[in-house]
Curated annotation (Swiss-Prot):
Organism: Xenopus laevis (African clawed frog)
Motif (SUMO interaction motif 2 (SIM)): 305-311
A biological process from GO: protein ubiquitination
Motif window: SUMO interaction motif 1 (SIM): 280-284
Subunit structure: Monomer.
Tagged with keyword Phosphoprotein: no
EC number: 2.3.2.27
Catalytic reactions of this protein: S-ubiquitinyl-[E2 ubiquitin-conjugating enzyme]-L-cysteine + [acceptor protein]-L-lysine = [E2 ubiquitin-conjugating enzyme]-L-cysteine + N(6)-ubiquitinyl-[acceptor protein]-L-lysine
Family stated for the protein in its record: Belongs to the Arkadia family.
Example of a GO cellular component annotation carried by this entry: PML body
Protein name (Swiss-Prot/TrEMBL): E3 ubiquitin-protein ligase arkadia-C
Sequence motif: SUMO interaction motif 3 (SIM), positions: 360-364
Length: 967
């Protein structure tokens, strides 16, 4: 088929041929009847609708009706996707040729085209070609197909025939790059199965198609530039997947991937292309419930070059509602497990459009295991994953990734094959193996390896063994051929042998494949096929990946993003949840992976070098976003090659950005089987890594995961601890850097000085001491403490010297920066203190005062008293104490005489002086003290005053300002 298709689509396929020249992969697929059974059945069903080829493809048709429905959905999706390919026009011609040639082949090509569509953009060495085909075809066909599903089908078939050499490229581009892939699939389906034309309702609008076309063209350019570097690598992978074997297993897997969610869940419900934004780089498996307008993929661009496609929560929700799991369970039990997973997979791809960022983060949510798996450069592996892990969201994501610019990201693709290991069941793994063998092996050939962009093969550390590590299943052998991309898978696979979806190590590519790092973190999550899809490309992470994690609500899938994640590490760590798709063991591994994924994404070198590379890869892009989360060790857990539950490095000190940790929570709970402990970086996948997730995992999840039971508490504890640690780190940082408001030393103690503010002394009533504040402080601080926010003992850091020696009370040790604001109300009456705190961000000044605020207040009072008042020596020195004598007796007598002469009475009061403090008339011989201002007071009265205030009670002149004029 591939040969035929190659001839059919020589100009586009030629490049893809070079890359996708994996007829042997097709052969491998055929040679793996047992493993390709699922795909075969899919193909048979699809082809049965298309042609008599159904019989040969129905070898392993577990449920023809269901398969057919699924295939219909897939075909519809493929049609939609292919419809929107740049092959649109040639697709019609090719479709006719193909129909003449082989309707079955056409169907396969359709699948392949779908795969091509998925992988084309980023996977094919001719990323541009594949992408262009995908974009143009997608755009043209979706438009054409949107109106008429039938037209889209023939065109799709033609496209498939034409694309067959790049079927996987197409399918990848469709999944990854073709935003219209959903409607294309829908449209294609309608041709073969008009009953599914309803999926056309999800078709994109013309405007969306145009947008998608533009984006695809962009990707094409970027992909071509990137693939020029990795021509054979990514193209080969895509093409390998496109190869017939790939087509029947890989492409079909992808198709199934597309179809399964819709069929399984909604029987042909196609992801509404319209729902998805053209900007969406990710193409979701149509199998997931249709992405309605409300579910449309949101594309966030941190950068014009980065597109993050976030599949609407509704869509994801449906995908993750029970169907994904139910189907996952079913899938794991049947050859079609892969298919279902693939179909159930919703692919959200973050596609850095920048050239270097040949990584596309494929945030694929597996309907079964709706996880967001950022699959960067998953397209290379994507097809194999589609094939191998066709049911794994990675398959789709991988395809998407492939469609994304990252053909070179073969790594991510490689991670996708890891997903097939689904390890839903050995059968599933076999299926994956088969798929991988047929699809991945198709990719497996040198070209297939390029699927993981060239760096994938270069990053052989994750190579073949990674598959073995991951699955120790047929996958291993099957994946080994793709050791280059498997290296990325390697971590995922070995993380959770059963985590077929452990995204290939692509995430880990960091060390191995500079370009492949996109999938690095996600792979851990990729443990589950769904997880694979949710990997966040660190590079893509700059885009908002947090939704992916949420997107994965259906599964344990961590919040894959965020992130993307950003911190992302967050996204990577969120990937950890992906493990849910795999069996308990898988989930366990995956949990660790997931944990590592997000957290480890940053903890690059956890276990295997591939993992390390992947982790590092994640780290590379994420490092800035998220400081090594100390999840890195956590990441290792899933990265542990052979042992899925290999004790991951002890949970690293969580030095990650707080933002990343949040996402760990959502998807995990939804999946019971998913054992992937969420992102926590616990050393063992679940023991440590599950720490955050366990909070969300049901007890069953916890018990299922190796250490989940312990992890859940640990996760909660870790989560709180991480938060606390982060807060503490931030606080320390701020404190260590006095320039930061928070870190500033206590509000310049000199302000606290009694004389600060020109003698506006702050008399701090006892009420102002910590006791009155303890209630509020305790409420905030202790709440934080009780929640586990036990910040490290308060560090004085560069506290003011005056404050440094004060050791905060144990209760205040945990006072977080945010807790102190409660003190402000107590200080309301003290403008001084409030002023001090105001400059410090309101809460900053508290940091310095943290535990010692009360002591500081007391100290201030003591200092204030001493400083404000005058010592007895000063009083004696600056004042004139003496015995009071009536003065001016002569003057008074003279005045009295004068008054008498005038007939006036001289008031006697004039002759009397009063002490204004006690208001008593000064009597002769009393001890009086004359201040420098010449005011006279009783010594006893004025001394008491001066002890507290050195200023004259009458004129407020400081006794130190001038020496007494009288001796």
């Amino acid at each position: 088929m591939k040969s035929e298709v190659s001839s059919d689509a020589p100009k586009r396929q030629e490049n893809l041929k070079g890359v996708l020249l994996n007829p042997e992969a097709i052969g491998a697929s055929k040679s793996f009847p047992g493993e390709v059974e699922m795909i075969t059945s899919k193909v048979s069903n699809e082809f049965s609708h298309l042609c008599s080829d159904t019989n040969k493809q129905q070898i392993d048709l577990n449920s023809d009706g269901t398969e057919q429905e699924k295939n219909l959905v897939v075909h519809k999706k493929r049609k939609s996707q292919q419809a929107g390919t740049s092959y649109a026009q040639s697709c019609e011609v090719k479709e006719n040729q193909r129909l003449l040639r082989l309707q079955p082949q056409s169907d396969e090509d359709n699948d392949s085209s779908f795969s091509d569509c998925i992988s084309s953009p980023s996977s094919s060495s001719h990323f541009g070609d594949s992408d262009t085909m995908t974009s143009d075809e997608d755009k043209d066909n979706p438009r054409r197909y949107s109106p008429a599903g039938i037209n889209s089908t023939p065109r799709t078939q033609s496209a498939r025939a034409q694309k067959w050499p790049r079927p996987h490229t197409d399918s990848v581009s469709s999944l990854v790059m073709k935003r219209p892939c959903y409607q294309v699939s829908s449209l294609r389906r309608p041709l073969h199965r008009k009953r599914f034309v309803k999926n056309v309702s999800s078709q994109r609008t013309q405007k969306q198609k145009e947008r998608i076309m533009l984006q695809r063209k962009k990707r094409e350019v970027l992909a071509r530039q990137k693939y020029a570097l990795l021509p054979s690598s990514s193209s080969s992978s895509e093409n390998d997947l496109s190869s017939e074997s790939s087509s029947s297993s890989s492409t079909e897997g992808e198709e199934d991937l597309f179809v399964s969610p819709g069929e399984n869940h909604q029987d042909g419900t196609t992801l509404p292309s319209g729902g998805m934004d053209e900007d969406v780089v990710v193409i979701e498996a149509s199998s997931t419930p249709q992405v309605t307008a409300n579910e449309e993929i949101n594309v966030t661009s941190t950068d014009s070059e980065v597109e993050i496609v976030t599949v609407g929560e509704t869509y994801r929700s449906r995908a993750t509602l029970g169907h994904p799991r139910s189907h996952w369970g079913q899938n794991s039990q049947s050859g079609r497990t892969q298919e279902h997973r693939t179909r159930n997979r919703v692919s959200t791809i973050i596609q850095p459009l920048r050239q270097n960022t040949t990584e596309v983060v494929d945030l694929t949510v597996d309907e079964d295991d709706p996880t967001v798996v950022p699959t960067t450069s998953g397209r290379v592996e994507s097809q194999p994953v589609s094939t191998v892990s066709s049911n794994t969201s990675t398959s789709e994501p991988a395809s998407d990734s492939v469609s994304g610019l990252l053909g070179s990201r073969g790594c991510a693709v490689s991670e996708t094959p890891a997903i097939p290991p689904n390890s839903n069941t050995v059968g599933t793994i076999a299926d994956d193996s088969r798929t991988s063998t047929s699809g991945t092996n198709a990719d497996g050939g040198p070209p297939a390896m390029p699927r993981l962009p060239s760096c994938c093969p270069q990053h052989s550390p994750c190579g073949g063994s990674s598959q073995n590590h991951v699955l120790g299943h047929p996958h291993s052998s099957c994946f080994q051929p793709h050791s280059h991309h498997f290296p990325h898978h390697h971590h995922h696979h070995h993380h959770h042998s059963s985590h077929p979806g452990v995204p290939l190590s692509p995430s880990f590519r960091d060390s191995h494949c500079p370009v492949e790092r996109n999938a690095a973190v996600p792979p851990p999550c990729g443990a589950t096929s769904g997880s694979g899809s949710t990997y966040h490309d660190p590079q893509a992470l700059p885009v908002d990946l947090s939704n992916n994690g949420i997107r994965n609500h259906g599964s344990v899938s961590f919040h894959s993003t965020s992130a993307f994640d950003p911190c992302c590490p967050g996204s990577s760590s969120r990937s950890t949840v992906y493990g849910h798709q795999s069996t308990t063991s898988n989930a366990q591994t995956m949990a660790i992976d997931g944990y590592g994924s997000s957290m480890v994404a940053q903890a690059q070198p956890q276990t295997p070098s591939p993992l390390s590379s992947c982790r590092h890869y994640m780290h590379a892009s994420y490092t800035s976003l998220t400081r090594p989360l100390h999840h890195q060790t956590s990441a290792c857990p899933h990265s542990n090659p052979a042992s899925q539950p290999p004790p991951p490095p002890p949970p690293p000190p969580m030095d990650y950005v707080i933002a990343h940790q949040v996402p760990f929570i959502s998807p995990l709970p939804s999946l019971t089987s998913t054992h992937a402990v969420p992102p926590p970086p616990p050393s063992h996948h679940l023991s440590t890594a599950a720490a955050p997730l366990p909070q969300h995992l049901s007890t069953s999840h916890q018990s299922m995961s190796h250490h989940i039971s312990a992890t859940a508490p640990a996760t909660q504890r870790l989560h709180a601890h991480e938060v606390i640690q982060r807060m503490e780190v931030q606080r320390r940082r701020m404190m260590q850097h006095p320039t930061r408001a928070h870190e500033r030393p206590p509000p310049h103690p000199h302000r606290m000085h009694p004389n600060y503010g020109h003698g506006h002394h702050i008399h701090v009533p006892q009420t102002m001491s910590s006791h009155p504040r303890q209630g509020p402080e305790r409420s905030a601080w202790e709440i934080a403490i009780e929640t586990g926010v036990t910040a490290a003992p308060y560090q004085t850091g560069p506290l003011h010297t005056h404050l440094a020696h004060y050791h905060p009370p144990p209760r205040l040790h945990h006072l977080q920066i945010g807790a102190l604001p409660l003190m402000v109300p107590d200080m309301a009456g003290y403008p001084h203190i409030r002023y001090i705190s105001s400059g410090l961000d309101g809460r900053s000044f508290r940091v310095p005062f943290r535990g010692n605020f009360e002591e500081l207040i007391h100290l201030e009072e003591r200092l204030g008293n001493v400083n404000r008042g005058a010592s007895q020596g000063t009083i004696e020195r600056c004042t004139y104490p003496h015995k009071y004598k009536k003065v001016s007796t002569d003057w008074f007598s003279q005045r009295k005489l004068h008054s008498k002469q005038d007939g006036e009475e001289a008031p006697e009061e004039d002759t009397e002086e009063k002490c204004t403090i006690c208001l008593s008339i000064l009597e002769e011989g009393e001890d009086v003290r004359r201040l420098p201002c010449m005011h006279l007071f009783h010594q006893v009265c004025v001394d008491q005053w001066l002890i507290t205030n050195k200023k004259c009670p009458i004129c407020r002149v400081d006794i130190d300002t001038q020496l007494p004029t009288e001796s």
